[in-house]
Amino acid sequence: MAQQSLFYSFIARGTVILVEFTDFKGNFTSVAAQYLENLPSSNNKFTYNCDGHTFNDLVENGFTYCVVAVDSAGREIPMAFLERVKEDFYKRYGGEKAATDQANSLNKEFGSNLKEHMQYCMDHPDEISNLAKAKAQVSEVKSLMMENIEKVLARGVICEMLGSSESQPQAFYIKRTQMKRKKWFQNMKIKLIVLAIIIALILIIILSVCGGFNCGK
């Protein structure tokens, strides 16, 4: 059994805690309620340190996914846990399903899911770390590719515009709309190709990390 590095988690809509889980006794609910009142509502990820513990949050579309961990757990494992919980929660209650639920109304339905995800992340720290590194690599590759694509597109359009203006100055303004349309189609075509490459990279990296098709769920 792995060390208990994650010990309390909740999911809230605004300041309403819909579901929470912990194996420990304490005033977690009241602390969480006060904590939510001061948490930024914008979509983002936050980590706050307090007395050797971290409050790790993922805020998205009005929902807050939070896990309290020991400081030594770092940031990768808590954030990986939150991503897993968010995906699971959205599959079950996405859209309007969780928009009107009352406080703690999902404890019975989803509390055990929080426990399972928590235990999985604590039991598989190496896998979590490898996946985090893989995602970082994919994000870096995507960022570089998109940056280069934008530069190539911009250069091509500028050259074409200059060529048009030199050979036919009177048609320069007329062709602006055509060139914008052409640039949009070029942009979409290349982005679709990049998306396919990125998906292939993600699959290759995940398969290499998990050892083929034997990834644990």
Swiss-Prot record:
Entry keyword set: Coiled coil, Endoplasmic reticulum, Membrane, Protein transport, Transmembrane, Transmembrane helix, Transport
Keyword hit for Transport: yes
Segments forming domain v-SNARE coiled-coil homology: 130-186
Membrane topology: Single-pass type IV membrane protein
Ranges facing Cytoplasmic side: 1-192
Main location class: endoplasmic reticulum
GO BP term, pick one: protein transport
Family, as annotated: Belongs to the synaptobrevin family.
The protein's name: Vesicle-associated membrane protein 723
Species of origin: Arabidopsis thaliana
Gene giving rise to this polypeptide: VAMP723
